[in-house]
C-alpha cells in the first residue's frame, strides 16, 4: 500500500481546482512513512484519492502534485511525456521567433513542479528546486538524455530555496561537454554571450526577451539609462533601436565586462555605450543632484521580496527607486519598469508606480504592460506562475 497524505476536512478544495500545492496547514496526518521527496498519494479526510505528489516534510509546501490522474505513475515515461508536451510549444515559438534558446520547462506550469530547464543552443541547464524534483533526478535526466541526445546537461541547482526543503546546493556537469565560459546565443537579431556556469540563475534572463525587443520602439535618438543592466541585453537592444547613448549600471564588473563584449559582438557603436559599476540607488541620487536627464530609463531590479513578511519593505524599495527614475526623465520620457517578485501583484506594482509619480511631482501615463515571455507560460490553475510584470510609463 502506498504512503498517503490525508487532508483535513474541507481542505481539498484547491486540489479539486487542480492547484499543485498542498500546504502544511491542510494536512491532517500521514499514513505510512515517506522519505524526503518520495512520491505519495494525497487523499481527502474520507480517503478519496485526489492526486499523486512529492512529499517535503521540511517545507511549508508539504506536497507538490505530479499528477491528478490515478493511473499515471511517476517514472521515466512520465517525464518523457511532460517534456514532449512542453517541447511542442517551444518548437513553435523557436521557429516563429528564430530562437536557439528558450525555457523548456517552467515548473508547475509545465506539470513538473520544482523543475526549471533552460535550453541554450545544445546545452540544457537544469534547476531542481524542490525535494520531489531532486528525488526524481535520475528519471528526469534519463528522459532528457533520450529525448535530447545532442545536448549536454549542466546542473545549476545552486539556489538558496533548496535549503528550505532540507537539501544541499548542487552545481556541475551532468552529461556531455562542459559549456564554454561564454556561450553565444541569438535573440531577436542580437547575439548575446551567456555564462552558464557562473551567471545569474541559469546564466541569462530569458523571461525578459519580449521586453527587450519592445524597448526598441522607444529609444531612437534617445538617451537611455539601463539600471541593473547585468550583461547588457537591454543595452544591446537599445543600440539596435538607434539610441544616441545608453548608460548601463550594475554592481558586478564581470557582468559589465560581458555587456561590453555583447556590444562589440553585435558590431554596434561602442562610443554610444557607457558602463558604470555602482549601486543603482546611490547613482540615481547622484544623477538627480547634479541635474542629469534621460529620455528612457529601464528599471529591471532583482527580486526585492522573498516572503510575505518582506512585502512592505519591498514596496518602499520599489517606490523609492521608481520615484528617482521619474525625477530623472525629461518631459515625455519613458520609464520601462519591472518587478520579478512573485508576491508583488500587477495591481500593487501599478499603484506603487502611481505613488512614486506623486512623490516625484510628476504625472505618468501607463502606455504598455509587460509579462514574462511566452516560453514561460502560466497554467490557469497556478496563477503564482505569473511572477514577472512590467509597465511602460510616459512621464508628463
Swiss-Prot record:
Gene3D superfamilies: PUA domain, RNA methyltransferase domain (HRMD) like, Vaccinia Virus protein VP39. SUPFAM superfamilies: PUA domain-like, S-adenosyl-L-methionine-dependent methyltransferases. It is found in: Cytoplasm. The keyword Transferase applies. GO terms for molecular function: RNA binding; rRNA (cytosine) methyltransferase activity. One of its GO terms (cellular component) is cytoplasm. InterPro entries: PUA, PUA-like_sf, PUA_sf, RLMI, RlmI-like_PUA, SAM-dep_methyl-trfase, SAM-dependent_MTases_sf. Signal peptide: none annotated. Its EC number is 2.1.1.191. Residues 2-81 form the PUA domain. Keywords: Cytoplasm, Methyltransferase, RNA-binding, rRNA processing, S-adenosyl-L-methionine, Transferase. Pfam families: Methyltrans_SAM, PUA_3. The keyword rRNA processing applies. It catalyses: cytidine(1962) in 23S rRNA + S-adenosyl-L-methionine = 5-methylcytidine(1962) in 23S rRNA + S-adenosyl-L-homocysteine + H(+). NCBIfam families: PRK15128.1. Specifically methylates the cytosine at position 1962 (m5C1962) of 23S rRNA. HAMAP family: 23SrRNA_methyltr_I. Belongs to the methyltransferase superfamily. RlmI family. This is Ribosomal RNA large subunit methyltransferase I. It comes from Escherichia coli O139:H28 (strain E24377A / ETEC). The gene is rlmI.
